[in-house]
Amino acid sequence: MRRAGRSRQFSSVEEAFSTSAARPGRRGRRSGRENTAKFVPATLSASTSFSRIEGISSRSVTLASPGSRSGSGPRSGPRLGPANRSTSRYRWVPAAAGWTVGVIATVSLLGSVSPLIRYLIKVPREFINDYLFNFPDTSIAWSFVLALLAAALTARKRIAWLLLLGNMILAAALNVADIAAGDNTAAEIFGENLGFAVHIVAIVLLVLAYREFWAKVRKGALVKAAAVLVAGDVVGILVSWGLVELFPGTLARQDRLPYVVNRVVGFALADPDLFTGRPHVFLNAIFGLFGALALIMATIVLFQSQRAENALTGEDESAIRGLLELYGKNDSLGYFATRRDKSVVFAQSGRAAITYRVEIGVCLASGDPIGDPRAWPQAVDAWLGLCQTYGWAPGVMGASTQGARTYREAGLNALELGDEAILRTSEFKLSGPDMRGVRQAVTRARRAGLTVRIRRHRDISPEAMADTIARADAWRDTQTERGFSMALGRLGDPADGDCLLVEAIDRDGSVVAMLSLVPWGTTGVSLDLMRRSPSSPNGTIELMVSELALNAESLGITRISLNFAMFRSAFEQGAQLGAGPVARLWRGLLLFFSRWWQLETLYRSNMKYQPDWVPRYACYEDARLIPRVGVASVIAEGFLVLPFSRRDKVHTGHHPAVPARLAQSGLLHHDGSAPDVSGLRPERTDAEEARSRLPEQVRVRLAKLKVLQRNGVDAYPVGCPPSHTVAQALDADDQQDITVAGRILRIRDFGGVLFAQLRDWSGEMQVLLDNSRLERGRTADFTAAIDLGDLVEVSGQMGFSKKGTRSLIVTDWRMIGKCLRPLPNKWKGLTDPEARVRTRYVDLAVNPESRELIAARSEVLRSVRQTLFAKGFIEVETPILQQIHGGATARPFVTHINTYDMDLFLRIAPELYLKRLCVGGVERVFELGRAFRNEGVDFSHNPEFTLLEAYQAHADYRVWIDGCRELIQNAAQAAHGEQTVLRPGADGRLQPVDISGIWAVKTVHDAVSEALGEQVDPGTSLSTLRKLSDAARIPYRAHWDAGAVVLELYEHLVEDRTEEPTFYVDFPTSVSPLTRPHRSRPGVAERWDLVAWGVELATAYSELTDPVEQRRRLQEQSLLAAGGDPEAMELDEDFLQAMEYAMPPTGGLGMGVDRLVMLITGRSIRETLPFPLAKPH
């Protein structure tokens, strides 16, 4: 919804929410929450508006910079990393002053509480107090003031510099006055001169180091803090006055009230000699304690008011929610940025923000920046500028890998903090040995009668939500709600309607446990709150998590972020077998601390769900700051609770941090609800930035497209069939009206006459545009709108140009497709083979040879089908996804079906399913389809290929010798008009080779014998074959039998050297598991391979129909698979059961159609496939 009361109206959502980063801003002292309104952005664009790294080791301590960031824009302001600190020669002054005052504060405190220390330091304390610096004997209040001053000096606070400088000037003036009095002893004169010299040196150094004290103090409730201080001092004075009246000691009555005021309020700065007498010694410490308590309370109130005054405003939260809607898809902790006790700083562009909290001088950022990742560096710069402005030490808790890299680029270092547990709901299941513990816990909870209810917060009534909040408070095991970077800290807020509540309900209908989860983008949830009743049964949490994961699809959830496990890798590595002593010691130390902080419990409670572990990092500026950042994190997360601390659940901020233009847009809501960002498209890059990266010709064409659109021309209209193809138009009568459509390849402009070359699938023709013949517009309009590559539709009549070229005389034309990228060279086309593969569409558009190859492939496929149909075969389709990989020996591709939670294989061959059809009585059957083998890619292999398998009942492998030859010869006839194939000639050009007639047939063993010059037959021993292989330098494996060695010899010595098409028959039985043994020759199977010019084209079997023998052979294959052979076939019980119903004697053929096309066209497989697999860039 939009809110009324805007200061102005914007024409679009994009205009209001976008902010230009073109005007570089200054960071430094102008970059902070209080100064964000001073940024004046330029004109806005839709894509820079309110509009998302890799390679970090989970154990890395320092993240390497990946280099430049595309589109991030220039950094504004100086870097604040350790290497970019002040280089002034006085940069040491703040630390030295802080340490000096801090030492005095520490000694003063010890002296105030210990009489022994007070006695030991009496002489130096009196000298310092008299001549150098205020150092009363006992004043806890003064010690606290000095401690605050020391901390402020170290943090380079300007106000601390001013106070210390004023103190030094006043002390120097007092020394001058004492020296001028002239009634001092020699010791006093020495002390006064020494003190004056020290004061002058300190004053000079402070003045020279003025620029080193740049830090400001945040706005806070000074009046409220002063009131608390006055009230505390008044109470302290009254109580102290009463005590001194009860225990006056020797203190005179008229001096008692002034003495108390000096000790409680005046920090005992007045000389004790001014008062008559002394009270009891123990009262001085009590009086100073009262003063210190008043100061402490006032300081806490001031700090709390600073945090509350500068916390999220409603507009800030509304802007953050808008950024989350546009860019929060990948940040599981992003929603926690809406926590209202945090502060926020925005990038100058308004496209990113960082939420943070200040504890003990550490500005602790909460996780990753929110918003557009391209604007993250700007947000980090603004945040570091804020730290510099107020003298805070920067720190980050819970950054992701991408976020940690961004912080690293800004000068911080990163340390692995732990891992976040992410459940992928599509992969979650209760089955399997790894989930046994969860499965048993869920079973126990269900037996106890528990059920689970899942609702969105918006669907819960106010009364029910009140009960939920009461239960959450009652079941909390701590006094306060914990959390900072990974907790929301509130329940029942109307703005959190998308949050998810999961409840466990017992048999009586009572809620016994609950989970509250915040949105993570649109398809995820992130755990915020987990509570359970002490009376809930074991397994309650496991039941809720499991039910949420198992029912996630109905809720539109694909991922769940569970708890965060600190030091997960240390627990895991230290428990591994063979872990080193350091890993075991570190794990033991963590186990010890787990007694109090549940480190191991959180790890194990997440690990049982088998989640994905995503590392999270802590970032810091300097290693010396790690302890301080750690303590600040402990305080922020609520493990260390400071007095009077509170965590606000409502908006307390009064200083909006959103950029002024965004705040004035009227789109942000004061109640913190999300703005209307439906008109924004976050996935789009900045238009100007994107256009600047495009080639010039593309930008020119885009500009023409915009001109056409402005003129009302649809550059991509609805299709209308042309009356003629180009080929038909060239043969048409001159008086016939003709409409053709195609792509413009060339344009020649002669002023009033224009010639263009137009191509469609059937061919090319010249079109002639003459101003005198055009019915609408002029040739200039054509040249202004049309570029090479554009698709146009032209109408007219056929005629001739002056040079006698047959042309279409155009009377009308229209654009039917604007080409935004230029075509390759009009004469050479695409010459790079890799480019032709990757941009096949361009190759087809400009290269006639590529079109001819596509057409030839189509003719081959059609011929194969027609030949088989003519023989009475029927075509079928069998499953491509198979549960068992079989039918051939090859490595399969593996995928997974979530519904049945099982692996499936892309088929390597359709053979086993086709044979099932043969069992069923389909006597002549074939399939022409895709098969997949996870093997090499080269000139003749592609992982995805077209395979023909055909089976003919009552036939054998000899029948398919003639059948296969006929298939190939018919295909060549269809492609070339004659039974020829193309082969490279002596000059490298393709020449036709006749393949008509009968082809040669040889046995495998005879062919191997010819190649070796030694006789080899099925009875040749394995040892002899090995010797022959060694002599021929053919490698083999030790576990191969004689058949495998013969096959290896055949592949190297015969197949690779074959030229003319040849059938090699009778392969060894051991390498043909699905083939019947030869009817008359033992040791070989009835199988042949067709080889031509070194490439295997087809294979055929007399199929093995004996189910007993088939089972034995497949069992042998399954043993090989179990032994680790990835290519061996698995045992398919369903296929074997089908074979037991008897399959008729059958001859089977398998042919690689891609290789057939290669043979006929003389091209490689990459050239003949429309889209071969190409290695990614």
Curated annotation (Swiss-Prot):
Taxonomic classification: Bacteria, Bacillati, Actinomycetota, Actinomycetes, Mycobacteriales
Membrane topology: Multi-pass membrane protein
Region annotated Lysine--tRNA ligase, chain positions: 677-1177
Record's keyword annotation contains Transport: no
Reactions catalysed, as given in the entry: tRNA(Lys) + L-lysine + ATP = L-lysyl-tRNA(Lys) + AMP + diphosphate; L-lysyl-tRNA(Lys) + a 1,2-diacyl-sn-glycero-3-phospho-(1'-sn-glycerol) = a 1,2-diacyl-sn-glycero-3-phospho-1'-(3'-O-L-lysyl)-sn-glycerol + tRNA(Lys)
Compartments where located: Cell membrane
Main location: membrane
Transmembrane regions listed in the UniProt entry: 93-113, 135-155, 159-179, 189-209, 227-247, 281-301
Name this protein carries in UniProt: Lysylphosphatidylglycerol biosynthesis bifunctional protein LysX
One GO MF term attached to the UniProt entry: magnesium ion binding
Role summary: Catalyzes the production of L-lysyl-tRNA(Lys)transfer and the transfer of a lysyl group from L-lysyl-tRNA(Lys) to membrane-bound phosphatidylglycerol (PG), which produces lysylphosphatidylglycerol (LPG), one of the components of the bacterial membrane with a positive net charge. LPG synthesis contributes to the resistance to cationic antimicrobial peptides (CAMPs) and likely protects M.tuberculosis against the CAMPs produced by competiting microorganisms (bacteriocins).
The enzyme's E.C. designation: 6.1.1.6, 2.3.2.3
Binding residues for Mg(2+) 2: E1096
Low complexity compositional bias, start-end: 65-82
Cofactor, how bound (note): Binds 3 Mg(2+) ions per subunit.
Region described as Phosphatidylglycerol lysyltransferase: 1-676
Domain of life: Bacteria
Any single Pfam family the record assigns to this protein: LPG_synthase_C
Listed cofactors: Mg(2+)
Compositionally biased region (Basic and acidic residues): 681-693
Keyword Lyase: no
Amino acid composition bias (Polar residues), ranges on this chain: 8-21
A GO term from the CC aspect: cytosol
GO-annotated biological processes: lipid metabolic process; lysyl-tRNA aminoacylation; response to antibiotic
UniProt KW keywords: Aminoacyl-tRNA synthetase, Antibiotic resistance, ATP-binding, Cell membrane, Ligase, Lipid metabolism, Magnesium, Membrane, Metal-binding, Multifunctional enzyme, Nucleotide-binding, Transferase, Transmembrane, Transmembrane helix, Virulence
Region (Disordered): 1-40, 61-85, 673-693
InterPro entries according to UniProt: Aa-tRNA-synt_II, aa-tRNA-synth_II, aa-tRNA-synth_II/BPL/LPL, LPG_synthase_C, Lys-tRNA-ligase_II, Lys-tRNA-ligase_II_N, Lys-tRNA-synth_II_C, NA-bd_OB-fold
